[in-house]
Amino acid sequence: MAKQVFQTTFAGRELIVETGQVAKQANGSVVVRYGESTVLTAAVMSKKMATGDFFPLQVNYEEKMYAAGKFPGGFMKREGRPSTDATLTARLIDRPIRPMFAEGFRNEVQVINTVLSYDENASAPMAAMFGSSLALSISDIPFDGPIAGVQVGYVDGQIIINPSQEQAEQSLLELTVAGTKHAINMVESGAKELSEEIMLEALLKGHEAVKELIAFQEEIVAAVGKEKAEVELLHVDAELQAEIIAAYNSDLQKAVQVEEKLAREAATQVVKDQVTAVYEEKYADHEEFDRIMRDVAEILEQMEHAEVRRLITEDKVRPDGRKVDEIRPLDAVVDFLPRVHGSGLFTRGQTQALSVLTLAPMGETQIIDGLDPEYKKRFMHHYNFPQYSVGETGRYGAPGRREIGHGALGERALAQVLPSLEEFPYAIRLVAEVLESNGSSSQASICAGTLALMAGGVPIKAPVAGIAMGLISDGNNYTVLTDIQGLEDHFGDMDFKVAGTRDGITALQMDIKIQGITAEILTEALAQAKKARFEILDVIEATIPEVRLELAPTAPKIDTIKIDVDKIKIVIGKGGETIDKIIAETGVKIDIDEEGNVSIYSSDQDAINRAKEIIAGLVREAKVDEVYRAKVVRIEKFGAFVNLFDKTDALVHISEMAWTRTNRVEDLVEIGDEVDVKVIKIDEKGRIDASMKALLPRPPKPEHDEKGEKSERPHRPRHHKDHKPKKEFTETPKDSE
């Protein structure tokens, strides 16, 4: 295939697509250039169906540091495991693509996005999402796309598509919306307490922009797209399916309607084990035994899936007996743990999360060194999901993509209400431990995080709560569910998480299993979520009505002082000598930022006060008219040098020592004497003049004689106008200065 180039303009930047030049052995590949960001996307498919009961799709987003002209960090100087941002971007691309493959498709598919050059003002993640859809669409892989995604901002009341970095910093909204040309199928957002109306408007305008990108993709597919390959889809034997449904559907229906999770799982497992045993015996010697038993398992799964959906759409009954807009029982607890800086335990039905707060000096902030310029991350929210939370055994180790994603969602939701660095100069870490799970654990972690922050004395603007909404749709009719549990998440069509305060939304996340949802469904889901959010906030506020005014006794205390930027080097000292000495003497921790904000941390307030005094002394500046108790450190003919404080000296000229004439400095002061002086002048070079006599009473004027006349002055000798006396040069103290 010869190289072809396609070009358009999108959101004020040039969008160029190149095909047929690189990675030609992949099923489909494209180079996407957006602004000066360049992403290579390659899509490949295995030749045969993979084993397993799920679609093995893998999406990678690779950040190459050379793309930003940077060296990788670390000893190896080579890219290693994906960064958190790269992992989140890969998930962001995976989620709108996954629903676009046929039910029963089991061939392994890999989509690899490599960032080759990076322009911080032209979104590489959005270029990668565009490239992923296009590479699949022009390939022979049976992908029912295209899809596209855009970033949406909200600045000065205006919705902006793919905002620049400067606009993003000013934006009240950080939204990614993706979908087909017909509907939205993925949402990820953080927001500064925006209303449901603004969020809906942003979603719909984002989708209009998505349609533009899809039209461009369709143009390219028409020009270079391959014919789709015919692949085997996983299907079950129709006769076997009819036989099992007729014999066992009523038993499974009864089991599904058991309200308590563990009891329901046990009841359905009894039915499944019974059916499995019957068919294992019946087909024990059959040459296709493995296929038949795979079909039996799949049929039972489909029966359970169908019954859950039927109950909700037809009978309006949920597996646990709740109404469609009803929340499970709620419970909130603070101070669950001693010694820690704050803790909250939140329970919603059989979902439970423990959140633990840790406060630390700003030196503990996380340094993020990726494709963007290096920056420090002050707030971290980490989410852990141990297998015991669902009563199972399983893998233990580093957090997976799901845990990273759920942690990031909670981080976005809570970050919007945190105090500024000036108000609360701490690094903040929340860790959510999921102790039980029956759906919506990420939202439970947000609620528990709010409890921990408030109990720990972090002055958040308002409490935040989260709720997960679900959807059951049969094409013509739909039902929106509030507070979905595990079974409804597994067999439902949507998982729409909404977090926020009473004033507005702080985070959204939506994943669906169908190809899109309408504005009508979004509107209804947001309205139901708002009602549920307020109910949860009622419980949180009843548990802890206000943020505590004091930190935990175990939390580090802090004091801050502001110094001039040019004084930072004085406090740090050569090679850190001065600051290290202060830390060693007082036992505190000290952080200094580039703007001269000095933060002093310790559990001992006296140590903080001592360190503060030392630093204040180091950066203290003399001021005109201020009085100091100074020490004489050097004597010259023209005056004495005195130390005002620390390394700051001043000159007291001999003429400023007393109101009477003095010929010798030593007649008035000696080295080591302490004297009171007043600063009278500081020149442009910072040299300080001080006066002793300015603090002394001024002597009275010469007295009058008895007649009230002034005493006569001694007469100066007069010289004849032609007489020129010999000039004598005498060095005065001021001349010698």
From Swiss-Prot:
Bias (Basic residues) ranges: 715-724
Domain of life: Bacteria
S1 motif domain span: 625-693
Recorded catalytic activity of this chain's protein: RNA(n+1) + phosphate = RNA(n) + a ribonucleoside 5'-diphosphate
Any single biological process term in GO: RNA processing
Keywords annotated in UniProt: Cytoplasm, Magnesium, Metal-binding, Nucleotidyltransferase, RNA-binding, Transferase
Residue sites binding Mg(2+) per the record: D489, D495
GO molecular function: 3'-5'-RNA exonuclease activity; magnesium ion binding; polyribonucleotide nucleotidyltransferase activity; RNA binding
Cofactor(s) required, per the database record: Mg(2+)
EC number: 2.7.7.8
CDD domains: KH-I_PNPase, RNase_PH_PNPase_1, RNase_PH_PNPase_2
Residues in KH domain copies: 556-615
Disulfide bonds: none
SUPFAM superfamilies named among the record's database cross-references: Eukaryotic type KH-domain (KH-domain type I), Nucleic acid-binding proteins, Polynucleotide phosphorylase/guanosine pentaphosphate synthase (PNPase/GPSI), domain 3, Ribonuclease PH domain 2-like, Ribosomal protein S5 domain 2-like
GO cellular component, one term: cytosol
Positions of region (Disordered): 691-737
Subcellular location as annotated: Cytoplasm
Bias kind Basic and acidic residues: ranges: 700-714, 725-737
Record family assignment: Belongs to the polyribonucleotide nucleotidyltransferase family.
HAMAP family xref list: PNPase
NCBIfam families named among the record's database cross-references: polynuc_phos (TIGR03591), PRK11824.1 (NF008805)
Its job: Involved in mRNA degradation. Catalyzes the phosphorolysis of single-stranded polyribonucleotides processively in the 3'- to 5'-direction.
Name of the protein: Polyribonucleotide nucleotidyltransferase
Classification lineage: Bacteria, Bacillati, Bacillota, Bacilli, Lactobacillales
